[in-house]
Amino acid sequence: MAECSTLESLIEMGFSPSRAEKALAATGNQGIEPAMDWLVEHEDDPDIDEPSVVVPEDSDSGTTDTQGMDTCEERLPLTEEEKEKQTKRMMELIAQKQKEREEREKRERIEQEKQRRKQGQELSAVKQKIQEQEMQKAVEDRRREKQEEKLARDRVREKIARDKAERARRFGGAGSEPISPPAEASIPATTPSPSSPVQEPPTKKEYDQCRIQVRLLDGSALSQTFRAREQLAAVRLYVELNWPGGAPGPFNLLTSFPRRVFTEEDMEKPLQELGLVPSAVLIVARK
């Protein structure tokens, strides 16, 4: 009778018959409170609504079951006070389990957030390391480029110095002074006869120096005097070394009239051969 009363009480409290039967079987029919505790604790079990397997008790006849059922049917319903008490107990258990579940979920969320932050910090560290490596590589590349540019300028300077030394050796260290012709006193003076006048052929004037003006990108200009036999590379080097604030990058040299863009091959040619003597205006243009 007690078992039947407990089962019906659980059903009256809103539990399904299958859950109520399973709770009583799991708690060994120890009463309504253990059954309610079990129901609240196993509320989220996936198999909570599956029918329980009931092992029939060994009995001499079926009369006992019939009597038990009759007894259940004859049981008086719970009083309002008993229902209220049991309902209150059930609500307290449900509230307690809900609180425990919320606390557990909160701890899980905190742990997940810790893991997320840890992974984010690790990812940020990896990204920062990659950026530092890329920056270091860029610095090394730029340092190597500057070193190569310096070596190239040094080679041009050395070549210019060798050319100057060679000219000094050839012309006896005359420097920028033009070669002096033999003194007129050493040539015997002869008076041409009126009948046979002497006509001297016109002589082409040779220039040993040339004045170069270079117009920069911003409209300003650089001016310098070079030897007529110096290479055009000397002019480019002069521009690179004297450009206010440094050259912004690779550039070409050209003349406007007649228009001519000088190539890398032209850089090895003397100014005299390029037609820039005795003076010329060169224009800087970006490559």
UniProtKB/Swiss-Prot annotation:
UBA domain location: 1-42
Annotated signal sequence range: none
GO CC aspect terms: cytoplasm
InterPro entries named among the record's database cross-references: UBA (IPR015940), UBA-like_sf (IPR009060), UBA_UBXN1 (IPR041923), Ubiquitin-like_domsf (IPR029071), UBX_dom (IPR001012)
Coiled coil: 72-164
UniProt feature, compositional bias: Basic and acidic residues: 72-114, 129-169
Keyword Glycoprotein attributed: no
CDD domains, sorted: UBA_UBXN1, UBX_UBXN1
Bias (Low complexity) ranges: 176-197
Keywords: Coiled coil, Cytoplasm
PROSITE patterns on file: UBA, UBX
Main location as per UniProt: cytoplasm
Recorded superkingdom: Eukaryota
Annotated compartments: Cytoplasm
One Pfam family here: UBX
Domain UBX: residue ranges: 205-284
Segments of this protein annotated with the region Disordered: 44-207
Function per UniProt: Component of a complex required to couple deglycosylation and proteasome-mediated degradation of misfolded proteins in the endoplasmic reticulum that are retrotranslocated in the cytosol. Involved in ubiquitin-proteasome systems.
Protein name, entry field: UBX domain-containing protein 1
Annotated organism of origin: Xenopus tropicalis (Western clawed frog)
